[in-house]
Amino acid sequence: MLLGSHVSMSGKKMLEGSAEEAHKFGESTFMIYTGAPQNTRRKSIEDLNIEKGHEAMDKYGLSNLVVHAPYIINIANTTKPEVFQLGVDFLQNEIERTQALGAKDIVLHPGSHVGAGADKGIQQIIKGLNEVLTHDNDVRIALETMAGKGSEVGRTFEEIAQIIDGVTHNDRLSICFDTCHTHDAGYNIKEDFDGVLNEFDKIIGLDRIKVVHVNDSKNEQGAHKDRHENIGFGHIGFDALNYVVHHDVFKDIPKILETPYVGEDKKNKKPPYKFEIEMLKAQQFDSELKDKILQQ
């Protein structure tokens, strides 16, 4: 089963360190940012330690590496041309790094229309993606399903379909299906996941889903908030998320946990992934999981 989490990539080891961290958590796949998600500072491709990283991945049986684009990219912005242009240029740069890392998909939040309205935002995203996807490259941009917080675009399957339909080289667009986001956007992940998948299939097509983000939610269905919770401790619940993780449709697709670190002490929070992965593999909810995470 391809199950992993977001892991860090830093220091001298970079990708090799990411693979070691993923292995420590008992993962078979993992997701990274190529640098800090909130800024444009990046090490050169030569400094990402890619060769040793791939050796470590082979050694630990890790595959289907996923890259996440930084949050600062907003190609839906129509009010500030410089923000749009930075997004286009930086996304192009990130795609080159994704290719060098050997990942097939880079996950992208479609963007926020910052008050101009969803239709204008969608047109701007299409314009940006058409600029980016002219370069010869076989990395896919995985548009993420969004919660609809603020002016986020991509809160409905229809909005995402509109983007895909407008992009010329849309064979290079895939989808990252986020359980927390779709729940927060109003879809019934908890009680009717197959119904949600059927709707997605009709509007976009299940074959587009290449990454799944597995997160519980701190909010009720339709809250449009986007606050992740540990598996089984939120409003989606363990049974529904366990069903998602073991679903036949996602058998060969990397499933990535982005659940929060646990603990009150901000300087000493503990990663939950090893414990959540063990629990999902056992298919049995553990109500004492957070205590076990804290005791590690």
UniProtKB/Swiss-Prot annotation:
Leading EC class: hydrolase
CDD domains in alphabetical order: AP2Ec (cd00019)
Listed cofactors: Zn(2+)
Pfam families: AP_endonuc_2
Binding residue positions for Zn(2+) 3: H181, D226, H228
Cofactor-binding details, from the entry: Binds 3 Zn(2+) ions.
Binding-site positions, Zn(2+) 2: E144, D178, H213, E258
Record-linked InterPro entries: AP_endonuc_2, AP_endonuc_F2_Zn_BS, Xyl_isomerase-like_sf, Xyl_isomerase-like_TIM-brl
Keywords noted in UniProt: DNA damage, DNA repair, Endonuclease, Hydrolase, Metal-binding, Nuclease, Zinc
GO biological process annotation, one example: base-excision repair
Swiss-Prot/TrEMBL catalytic activity: Endonucleolytic cleavage to 5'-phosphooligonucleotide end-products
Record's keyword annotation contains Glycoprotein: no
UniProt superkingdom: Bacteria
Record-listed E.C. numbers: 3.1.21.2
SMART domains in the record: AP2Ec (SM00518)
Cystine pairs: none
Residues where Zn(2+) 1 binds: H68, H109, E144
Single GO molecular function: zinc ion binding
Family (UniProt): Belongs to the AP endonuclease 2 family.
Role played: Endonuclease IV plays a role in DNA repair. It cleaves phosphodiester bonds at apurinic or apyrimidinic (AP) sites, generating a 3'-hydroxyl group and a 5'-terminal sugar phosphate.
Protein name according to UniProt: Probable endonuclease 4
Natural source organism: Staphylococcus haemolyticus (strain JCSC1435)
Recorded name of the encoding gene: nfo
